[in-house]
């Protein structure tokens, strides 16, 4: 499994399918967002108290945009409160990167900046042009995380 840190704080990661839970445990990941069509094999080996979000989408047309926004905001909120989040799909290039790019816009990057950043870290990312065009059009937004 190729686990790649997206931010310098190493709180946001992308990967393909999880086939080894050791890197997840080693990096202290406490939230997994699974975009693939199958539940991860060996899920019972996941670290205790990991939040597992399962939202399978096809690597074709854009998913339901309001739900994509909610998921992007959730990832941004978690990263903004020092959780360690892994977003993954089968290969870690399109669906997972779409969600991460959406989250990055909620953390203040424009869609174009997010796309450039993600492609620099992961060459070939967002080769689904429908997804890439959507990301390019996203404005920079800054969430305000409130911890009660």
Please provide the spans of the model-predicted regions.
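Cysteine-based protein phosphatase catalytic domain of the PTP/DSP
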Residues: 2-84, 105-134
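Charged C-terminal helix
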Residues: 127-148
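A phosphate-binding catalytic loop at a beta-strand-loop-alpha-helix junction
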Residues: 78, 82-101
């Amino acid at each position: 499994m190729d686990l790649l840190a997206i931010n310098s704080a190493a709180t946001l990661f992308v990967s393909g399918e999880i086939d080894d839970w050791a890197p997840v445990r080693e990096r202290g990941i406490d939230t997994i967002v699974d975009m693939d069509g199958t539940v991860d094999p060996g899920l019972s080996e996941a670290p205790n108290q990991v939040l597992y979000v399962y939202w399978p989408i096809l690597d074709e047309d854009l998913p339901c945009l309001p739900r994509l926004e909610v998921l992007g905001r959730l990832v941004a909120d978690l990263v903004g409160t020092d959780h360690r989040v892994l977003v993954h799909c089968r290969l870690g290039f399109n669906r997972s990167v779409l969600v991460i790019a959406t989250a990055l816009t909620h953390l203040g990057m424009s869609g174009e900046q997010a796309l450039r950043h993600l492609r620099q870290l992961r060459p070939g990312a967002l080769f689904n042009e429908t997804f890439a065009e959507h990301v390019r059009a996203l404005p920079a937004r800054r969430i305000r995380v409130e911890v009660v």
